[in-house]
Amino acid sequence: MSNMKKDLLQQTSEDQNAIWATMVKNRLERLFLESREHENRYGLHASAILASDNDFCYREQVLSLFYKMNQGEQLPIKQLKIFAQGNAMHEKWYNLFRQAGIDVAIERSLFLTQYDLSFTIDALLNIFNEEIICDVKSQNTFAFRKQKGHPSGEKQVNFYLWALTKYTGIPHKKGFVLVDSKDDQEIKVVPVKYSKKAVEPYVDRLKEIQIMKQTFIKTHEMPKRKCANCDTKRASTCNMRDACFNIGMGRRKLDDV
């Protein structure tokens, strides 16, 4: 066999291997999307209620109470991989909490019917004979060393303190953000004391959504759109894009509604 034929056969084999490897890679990356295809739980998500004024949209939240969201299609696989890595870090801490016997509840999803609010606290821990909310966050080492606190995590813990108090009827006034440095595994504890003033804007949002929900039930009138059209940057990543603009899969009612 000539050297040219050998080279061609070798190249063909390498091409086939490359194609096969690409097919396997695509199939594995599809797993990140498939893992989210069943995430259609009913209710408002705490993270959406805590969004900034620029990102928060009443129309999106009211739609989410009646129609299915298309979130799996909106998040890029790269972002889903980051989420998966974060989940692995959370599991590390959950296992440690369980081994130490300080776990009261780990990732228990709760529902406030009054507000259609679904929320999941990372961990409720028994520390020094007191129930404390813990929210686990990861940071790159640069941010970890530069920041003293964790503003988004602190806001989240404060909201959970309010929500858990509403749910149980038992005051919960203390929590902390557990910040885990991605690169060197250093940790930081950011204490959070409940602030009624800080949580009020988000409680007001929940109340307003309930008013808008009843308006939609009675008149079928939705809040105004935040986005000018379905191709804006915000709309392209919106969980309720299809239902809002009645495109794609359109408005598919939730099974619970």
Ranges and model annotations:
Residues 1-133, 145-146:
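Metal-dependent nuclease catalytic cores that hydrolyze phosphodiester bonds in DNA/RNA
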